[in-house]
Each structure stands twice: as structure tokens, then as C-alpha cells.
């Protein structure tokens, strides 16, 4: 990955959202790097046949990172060895940012920010045992309080190719007013490796503001893509215009990919995606109530076609959606 000639654009891992069907849709809008949903090392080691489905990728994904979490070096080592057998995976991203209590309170995710020496040792284990070309880490600014300097200095000793920084602490969760790009800028000055800025990037204007403040080598965007997967195309072309795509066709394509990947179960799983796509449109509440009752492919597809009729759309402005607390 050459960070000298362009600013790289990354799709953030979002639990329950950034599966293969969604990533394949977003990839068409120019995102450079896609990342799997977070997978625990324990699940990879002890339930690989089931968990490995989360690490499948579409033919469109040329830079595909598998994101793993964990705190036990021996288990992380075994998980890395499992991923070694997956030739389509470009690299491993280690999660040190997940704020969910069931993750962080057990020393995983953002919980590792309380023991930076241990974090660095795990990153060394990953590098020493992976056969992939790329190793990266995603962090927050700290656990209870901000410690950007300490994290940056520690990661200078870690064998990673780039660092993704989410501009909040674990205790900040996803509070919009807590985002701190200045601390990302501070880490960028200290780190001797590329830095990717993440958090609250929901428009082209915001993207360029964050790049200016942080001087980051790229951007990682998550929640905004659920409503507007074309945001990467807009950033790459520095425009607020929309790409030549009919929203109904995009939603239907995503739905069809869900059914193809998950079977009939994909109908129910797609409800949350429809909630995001419909936000800001007239009759969105009624539509959500409707799709929450549908379980059959035919009836769901008909409802999508009716609601997302081009003439009904009132807004194509990227909007935020609320996610579950597992999302990073």
C-alpha cells in the first residue's frame, strides 16, 4: 500500500452491517480498502467453519482486511494461523477500539488500551505468525481518559503498516460532541507510520476538514456509508453531486446479494439496512413497520420497489443512523 501518492479511503468494520453483500455494494463507489466485521480470535479458533463465512469476500474486493480481536496471545496466534489458509485475505487488522462492555470489559477491543505493553506484544505475535503482507491496528484515544501520546509512542514499537485512530475514548462511546481530531493530529506527528483518521466523517466537506486538521494519510468511514454508500465516490471526486445511480436499483441489488449470500434468512437480516436506506424519506416510519413484518423474498422485494420508486424520494443527503453498541 503506497500512501505517498493518494489519500486512501477505508470502509470501517461495523458489526452486523459490513458483511460481504454490503461491502460489494460499497466497493463499486471507489472505496480502496474493505474490512470484515470484527471476528473474535476465540471464534476463529473454536468455531472456524461457522466464523469463516464472515471472512469471505466478493470478487470486487482487492484490498480486503480481516479484523480480529482478542487478548490471549496463544489464541490470537492460532487465529492468525487459521487466516493464513485464506488466500483472498490481504491482511489482518487488530481491533483495539470496540467499546462494547462484553468485549472491552474482558480485556479485548478498547480494553487493551489499558495495557499498551500487552497490546504491542499481541501485535508482534500477529506479525510473526501471519503470511499476509499487511498488518494494522485500530485504536481509540484511550479507555477512560485520552492518552494519545502514550498510544502513539507505544505503537511506534509495534510491527504494523498503518494505524487507524478513532477520535474518541472508550468512555466517549459515540457521543458526537466528544470527537477530537486534534488528538489524531498529535498522534500523526508522533507516529512513524501512516495514520488513518476515523469518526464522524459524514460528508465531503467533513472529510476534507478532517484531512486538513489531522494531516492523516487516509480516512475510514463507517456509519455514514449505511445511508450513503456513494460517499467514497463523492470524496474521491470532491463533489456533493450524486453518482449516476438510481437508489431503488442500488437497494434492490444489495437485497438480492443478501438473499444470495444468506438464503431466506437474508430477508430478515436486511431489515436493518432498509431502516438506514429509508431514513430521511417520506413515510419512512410506516415503511420500517411494514418491512419488520415481512419474511418472504417476493413480498420484501415488492415493498422495496414500491417505496424506493424514484419519484417518491425526497432526500438523497447522507444522514447518520443509530447503530448497536457493538459497532466500531
Swiss-Prot record:
InterPro entries xref list: Aldolase_TIM, DUS-like_FMN-bd, DUS_fam, tRNA-dHydroUridine_Synthase_C, tRNA_hU_synthase_CS
UniProt EC number: 1.3.1.-
UniProt: FMN binding residues: 13-15, 67, 138, 198-200, 222-223
Disulfide bonds: none
Alphabetical keyword list: Flavoprotein, FMN, NADP, Oxidoreductase, RNA-binding, tRNA processing, tRNA-binding
Reaction(s) the record says it catalyses: a 5,6-dihydrouridine in tRNA + NAD(+) = a uridine in tRNA + NADH + H(+); a 5,6-dihydrouridine in tRNA + NADP(+) = a uridine in tRNA + NADPH + H(+)
Cofactor(s) in the UniProt record: FMN
Annotated Pfam families: Dus
GO MF term (any one): tRNA binding
Active site: 98
UniProt function note: Catalyzes the synthesis of 5,6-dihydrouridine (D), a modified base found in the D-loop of most tRNAs, via the reduction of the C5-C6 double bond in target uridines.
Family to which this protein belongs: Belongs to the Dus family.
Protein name per Swiss-Prot or TrEMBL: Probable tRNA-dihydrouridine synthase
Native source organism of the sequence: Helicobacter pylori (strain J99 / ATCC 700824) (Campylobacter pylori J99)
Gene of this entry: dus
Amino acid at each position: 500500500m503506497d500512501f505517498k501518492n493518494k489519500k486512501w479511503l477505508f470502509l470501517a468494520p461495523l458489526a452486523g452491517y459490513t458483511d460481504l453483500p454490503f461491502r460489494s455494494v460499497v466497493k463499486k463507489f471507489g472505496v480502496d480498502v474493505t474490512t470484515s466485521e470484527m471476528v473474535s480470535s476465540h471464534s476463529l479458533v473454536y468455531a472456524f467453519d461457522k466464523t469463516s463465512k464472515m471472512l469471505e469476500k466478493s470478487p470486487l474486493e482487492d484490498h480486503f482486511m480481516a479484523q480480529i480481536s482478542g487478548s490471549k496471545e496463544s489464541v490470537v496466534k492460532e487465529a492468525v494461523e487459521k487466516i493464513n489458509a485464506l488466500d483472498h485475505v490481504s491482511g489482518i487488522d487488530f481491533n483495539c477500539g470496540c467499546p462494547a462492555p462484553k468485549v472491552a470489559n474482558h480485556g479485548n477491543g478498547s480494553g487493551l488500551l489499558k495495557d499498551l505493553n500487552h497490546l504491542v506484544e499481541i501485535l508482534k505475535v500477529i506479525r510473526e505468525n501471519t503470511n499476509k503482507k499487511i498488518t494494522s491496528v485500530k485504536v481509540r484515544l484511550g479507555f477512560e481518559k485520552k492518552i494519545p501520546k502514550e498510544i502513539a509512542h507505544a505503537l511506534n514499537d509495534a510491527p504494523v503498516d498503518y494505524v487507524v485512530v478513532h477520535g474518541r475514548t472508550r468512555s466517549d462511546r459515540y457521543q458526537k460532541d466528544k470527537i477530537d481530531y486534534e488528538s489524531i493530529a498529535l498522534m500523526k506527528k508522533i507516529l512513524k507510520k501512516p495514520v488513518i483518521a476515523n469518526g464522524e466523517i459524514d460528508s465531503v466537506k467533513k472529510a476534507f476538514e478532517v484531512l486538513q486538521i489531522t494531516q492523516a494519510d487516509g480516512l475510514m468511514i463507517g456509519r455514514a456509508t449505511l445511508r450513503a454508500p456513494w460517499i467514497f465516490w463523492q470524496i474521491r471526486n470532491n463533489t456533493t453531486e450524486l453518482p449516476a445511480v438510481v437508489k431503488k436499483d442500488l437497494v434492490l441489488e444489495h437485497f438480492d446479494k443478501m438473499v444470495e449470500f444468506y438464503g431466506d434468512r437474508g430477508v430478515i437480516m436486511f431489515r436493518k439496512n432498509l431502516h438506514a436506506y429509508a431514513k430521511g424519506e417520506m413515510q419512512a416510519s410506516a415503511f420500517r413497520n411494514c418491512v419488520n413484518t415481512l419474511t418472504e423474498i417476493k413480498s420484501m422485494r415488492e415493498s422495496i420497489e414500491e417505496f424506493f420508486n424514484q419519484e417518491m424520494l425526497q432526500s438523497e443527503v447522507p444522514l447518520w443512523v443509530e447503530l448497536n453498541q457493538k459497532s466500531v
